[in-house]
From Swiss-Prot:
The keyword Repeat is assigned to this record: yes
Keywords, ordered alphabetically: Cytoplasm, DNA-binding, Repeat, Transcription, Transcription regulation
TM helices/strands, residue ranges: none
Name of the encoding gene: mraZ
Subcellular location: Cytoplasm, Nucleoid
Subunit structure: Forms oligomers.
Protein name stated in the entry: Transcriptional regulator MraZ
Residues in coiled coil: none
């Protein structure tokens, strides 16, 4: 499970050093893809295969499903971290998420997410008030 917030930096080659707590889960390969809110989703190979299986069950007659699958999978890139836990984030995904040197890598349960540090701080500031006001009627089954 991916938990917490980490603040690594991109090096000049577009590489990220994976947070130590995430390396066991991602050390045998990972998949980057476009995330919602202009972040990058990071899945273990196993979890990505599970997500892909769910997508395969979507009706091909659904335009919304086709559109989502195309955007999601066309941006996907499978990568292998090196022995130091570094992994290159493809340039197209760095551009999509507007990444510069300072990052926020957050745990989101079954996946990690990579955000630009400023974008993450802005998102968190915007959403924290709504978070504190959320009750069990707003999100059934979670609280």
């Amino acid at each position: 499970m991916f938990l917490g917030t980490h603040s690594p930096r991109l090096d000049e080659k577009g590489r990220l050093i994976l947070p130590a707590k995430f390396r066991d889960e991602l050390g045998n390969g990972l998949v980057f893809t476009r995330g919602q809110e202009r972040c990058i989703y990071v899945f273990s190979q196993r979890e990505f295969e599970r997500v892909h299986e769910q997508m395969r069950d979507a009706p091909i007659s659904s335009r919304q499903a086709r559109d989502y699958i195309r955007v999601f999978l066309s941006g996907a890139s499978d990568e292998m971290p090196d022995k130091q836990g570094r992994v290159t984030i493809p340039a197209a995904l760095r551009a999509y998420a507007g990444l510069d040197r300072e990052l926020a890598v957050i745990g989101a349960g079954s996946r990690a997410e990579i955000w630009g540090a400023t974008a993450w701080a802005e998102y968190l500031e915007e959403k924290e008030n709504a978070f504190s006001d959320t009750d069990d009627n707003d999100i059934p089954g979670i609280l």
